[in-house]
């Protein structure tokens, strides 16, 4: 968790919204209980990844049945504070890929997402950390 906090603190936001999201995520990570599980009804961590072909001319997306739309791959931390492990597991589960190389270990983007229109809604927000 200390590594994640360090990454969050050193992350340079892309815009004002991401700056606000970053501060909220840092505050919640420092103070909230169960921030890596769905037990936290206010918010919890999720991860996503942009999967890019080796020659960087294609991306892999997955169809989300609940939202009826295409999206990048990802999922919930489900108690694991090592978000890199979480995204590797999600990539394998959702695509079958096991030989994945990160272009960077740095945070690609941060978002606080509301959970709207989801039939399994049991939380208000998700903290999303994206890898590339």
What are these regions (language model features)?
Residues 34-69:
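A glycine-rich, hydrophobic loop/mini-helix early in the fold
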Residues 1, 18, 22, 84, ...:
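A structural signal for well-ordered alpha-helical scaffolds and beta->alpha junctions
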Residues 96-132:
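Active-site segment of metal-dependent pyrophosphate-handling enzymes
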Residues 55-100:
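Conserved Nudix-box catalytic region and its N-terminal flanking loop in Nudix hydrolases
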Residues 10-48:
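Acidic, metal-coordinating catalytic segment for phosphate/diphosphate chemistry
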Residues 38, 47, 72-74, 79, ...:
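Generic structural "secondary-structure junction" signal
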Residues 2-12:
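Generic N-terminal amphipathic, Lys/Arg-enriched alpha-helix
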Residues 44, 64, 76, 93, ...:
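Histidine-centered active-site/metal-ligand motif
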């Amino acid at each position: 968790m200390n590594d994640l906090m360090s990454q969050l603190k050193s992350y340079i936001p892309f815009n004002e919204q991401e700056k606000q999201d970053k501060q909220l995520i840092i505050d919640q990570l420092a103070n909230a209980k169960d921030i890596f599980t769905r037990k936290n009804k206010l918010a919890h961590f999720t991860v996503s990844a942009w999967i890019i072909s080796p020659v960087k001319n294609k991306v892999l997306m997955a169809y989300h049945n609940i939202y009826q739309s295409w999206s990048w791959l990802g999922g919930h931390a489900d108690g694991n504070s090592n978000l890199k492990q979480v995204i590797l597991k999600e990539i394998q589960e959702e695509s079958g890929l096991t030989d994945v190389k990160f272009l960077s270990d740095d945070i690609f983007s941060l978002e606080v997402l509301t959970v709207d229109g989801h039939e399994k809604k049991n939380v208000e927000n998700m903290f999303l950390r994206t890898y590339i």
